[in-house]
Amino acid sequence: CGTGVSTDYLCHLNPGADVLGVDISDGALAVARERCQRSGAAKQVSSLRQEQRSLLDLEGEGPFDYINSVGVLHHLDQPEVGLRSLADRLAPSGLLHLFLYADAGRWEIHRTQKALSLLNAGTGSEGLRLGRELFETLPEGNRLARHHRERWAVDCAPDANFADMYLHPQETSYNLGCLFAFIETAGLHFAGFSNPEVWDPARLLKGELLERAQALPPRQQWELVEQLDPDISHFEFFLSAAPVERARWSDEALGLARGLVQPCLWGEPDPILGSNMEPIQLSDADRSLLRTVAEQPEQTLGALASPNQIRDLVDRQLLLLKE
């Protein structure tokens, strides 16, 4: 639950659901409750509970169709125990979304943490004072100071965020190999990144290099991206209790399917921002198709567009398919 950001939007995006948010911090829960009260989140769902509990203490809860755990497991003394606790409460067809620290993109954070530890800075107000003084004292050209200014200074303006980044007493970060080994400890299956564009080699390569990259199996493509982009500081991804098979739609099946415009797009009457608030470009034909699908939800797609146009919008996550 934390301060309720994800609890809030999950309520609004899943009307009629039963929602449980847990956190060990009473202060964070107070913020979460006020946030959800102001937004009217509880009115969107069948039930909303926000409780001061550990994710290790969820006996009698579940099974859940969807579990969202962001920035929690990597702060546990035994992250694998926390993962198994969540896995035990996942419905057979459910999804678990995790956010975990990535090792390579946090090198400057790890060095700063180690330096402050060697200086016996502590984790309280003294550590906060010394940590901020450290960045003010380091020479301007120092890589740690430069990376802090360029990447983290804005996020760390609040003292709580600075302490969470540089003074947290318990933290684990992962590379891809360790990440998949971690997933296997709970018997779960990797179901994809929630930010797949970050792991697309086309973001970094072109020409022959991109062709060679795209010929690799998916996991090796991701390993390549991990090596080429040292600024990736976290993993965000979905896990499932059972393997998820990607649906393969023939031209005939596409023609018989009905469509649903992605409900997380922004802009009326035509979307201008995607589900991640990224600008999207639509041709006149695409704009017309999305409008028609919204106005005629029971119309089969074959009567409205070609299979190639439908597939393109589906691949861009602008159009969802219904049998």
What does each model-identified segment do?
Residues 5-56:
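Class I SAM-dependent methyltransferase SAM/SAH-binding core
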Residues 95-147:
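Conserved class I S-adenosyl-L-methionine
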Residues 109-115, 148-169:
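Short, glycine-/aromatic-enriched active-site segment of Class I SAM-dependent methyltransferases
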Residues 65-79, 102:
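A short SAM/SAH-binding and catalytic strip from SAM-dependent methyltransferases
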Residues 56-67:
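A short acidic, Gly/Pro-enriched loop at the edge of an enzyme's catalytic core
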Residues 204-228, 234-235, 278-323:
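Long, charge-rich, low-complexity alpha-helical segments
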Residues 171-190:
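Short alpha-helix
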Residues 80-92:
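A short glycine-rich, Lys/Arg-flanked "PGG" loop and its adjoining helix->strand segment in the class I
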